Amino acid sequence: MNKTFSILTGLVMTLAASLCAAQAEDAPKVTVTPIKGPLYMLDGSGGNLVASIGDDGVLLIDADYAPWVEAHAAAIAGIDPDAASPRFLLNTHWHGDHVGGNEHWGTQGTVIMAHENIYQRMSTRQEMKALGRAVEPSPAAALPVVTYEDSIAVRFNGDVIQVQHFPTGHTDGDSVVFFTEQNVVHIGDHVFENAFPFVDIGSGGNVLGYLSNLEKVLAMIDDQTIIVPGHGTSLLSKQDLQEWVTMLKSSVSRVAALLQSGRTVDEIAENGLGVEYDSFGQGFIKEPMWIGFIAASL
């Protein structure tokens, strides 16, 4: 009897340990990439975060999806075990993969900052027709409490963080964040590394505005600037950004020329833009959708 009980107990303990190990493997894991000084890129499931961690505390750029909040908190604790909840959180735009964690941090007392258009979109029901979904208003704790129309400056952890609104690009509320002392830029969803970008036409985005914004950013940075993309695993250089912009501009020119020749959007999508663009359509936005964004923006 005792021997049987011991065997059963051992089996139960082994099964429990296996389940715990499986759960640990399935738990969200954030990849931490040191950038420079107090700055770190946190790569989870949605848009990339930048964390400034230092004597003034923690400041976050973007918040990923809600289920990833604890993973990001653990990543921050791994960098600095004494770090408290972020003092500030700044959203680059309103999409859920960038603001999903807002509610959690808002209830912890984090001051959330964003462009006024982000507040307006988060506080009202939004239709994302390109993706076939509706987004309900966010809870009060998730909403920005500090908003701006053009720009805002934050002095934190020895840096002057310049936040500049770039309208009519990815959406109508996007900001690019310049860490001026470190020469680091979080460019938000104005960059999808090695992929066609999502341009949210229904939220005031426009492909031509997107390209115009990127040209402006290129004029504001130098060859030593480190760029954090909204999506992607790599830190980028000015040259990387220039090459990506060149690809996007050439695809826009090709679609415009085909439309001018009498081709329909469906015909262009069916025939494709050419093998040189194939690799860029392997991400979230496939080539036919990118062609549609271009046509809707011309």
Model-derived regions: residue spans:
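Metallo-beta-lactamase
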Residues: 57-58, 65-67, 153, 160-250
